[in-house]
């Protein structure tokens, strides 16, 4: 009897709770649930259509199961797209991270009016769309009116092929990407530098530590969390690069710059083989997902190490 009274009291107490209080947990969870559903439904549809022969020209389609995947994995086009994607991402990341770190260290050490003016100037490429940046560089590299071409003429170099030659096309798009995205790496690394605690460096100075010793054993380990964040964002973007390459060469000359994104676009929208194009995108997603998990793990480990050094 007492147990029933307790249960009744608990039910009555629950019924007296205001509706807003009861609804609050559901309201908090709802946005995350909606976003998750919004992500999973297109992803599930992509997997499904990759197993079909779906085409925009023919609304009727049938299941081909893994035929698309097998054909693509046996195709030289796929493996060349993989190679182009990796090469492009590698060159971009090495240059952007290296230049971004060098510029960030320079600006952090200057810390004066010149440094502030440089920050404003360096942020400019981030303020324009990649397509706009590509158009600007097309004008700068033009053989007739380009300022870069005029500069090369001073050294006796005329008609440099830039994006017109398979030998220099990769160099050209990487150069534009580096110009556009190095400021992003610089800003993140500079923010990391300016957030470093001063006490470990003061202790090292008292102990007679050299500049190189401090950089290698203090600055770099404590800066790694910020560097991993910059690496993660830039690597994901470089692996799925589309705008700069398409705007400049549309993947040419020939198929020189046909990475996974452009190959998927060409297969799906130019050749109208939508089901055949999706495996390219899903492979790219899988690669980016695995790399992102690896970098996030490294970033967390670096955070723990940095916390230990700060103490």
Where are these regions (language model features)?
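Short, Lys/Arg-rich, polar N-terminal cytosolic tail immediately upstream
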Residues: 1-20
């Amino acid at each position: 009897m007492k147990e029933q009274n307790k249960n009744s009291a608990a039910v009555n107490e629950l019924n007296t709770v205001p509706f807003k209080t009861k609804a609050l947990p559901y309201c908090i969870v709802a946005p995350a649930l909606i976003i998750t559903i919004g992500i999973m439904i297109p992803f599930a549809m992509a997997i499904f259509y990759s197993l079909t022969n779906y085409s925009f020209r023919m609304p009727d389609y049938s299941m081909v199961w893994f035929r698309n995947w097998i054909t693509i994995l046996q195709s030289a086009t796929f493996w060349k797209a993989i190679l182009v994607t990796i090469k492009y991402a590698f060159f971009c990341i090495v240059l952007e991270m290296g230049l971004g770190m060098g510029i960030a260290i320079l600006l952090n050490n200057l810390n004066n009016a010149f440094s502030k003016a440089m920050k404003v100037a360096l942020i400019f490429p981030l303020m324009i769309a990649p397509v706009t940046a590509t158009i600007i560089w097309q004008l700068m590299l033009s053989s007739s009116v380009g300022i870069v071409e005029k500069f090369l003429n001073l050294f006796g170099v005329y008609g440099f092929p830039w994006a017109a030659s398979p030998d220099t096309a990769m160099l050209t798009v990487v150069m534009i990407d580096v110009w556009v995205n190095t400021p992003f790496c610089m800003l993140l690394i500079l923010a990391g530098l300016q957030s470093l605690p001063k006490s470990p460096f003061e202790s090292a100075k008292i102990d007679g530590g050299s500049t190189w010793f401090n950089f290698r054993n203090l600055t770099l380990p404590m800066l790694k969390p910020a560097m991993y964040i910059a690496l993660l964002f830039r690597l994901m973007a470089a692996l799925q690069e589309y705008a700069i390459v398409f705007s400049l060469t549309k993947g040419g000359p020939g198929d020189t710059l046909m990475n996974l994104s452009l190959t998927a676009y060409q297969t799906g929208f130019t050749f109208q083989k939508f089901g055949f194009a999706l495996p390219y995108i899903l492979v790219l997603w899988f690669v980016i997902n695995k790399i992102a998990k690896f970098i996030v793990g490294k970033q967390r480990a670096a955070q723990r190490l940095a916390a230990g050094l700060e103490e």
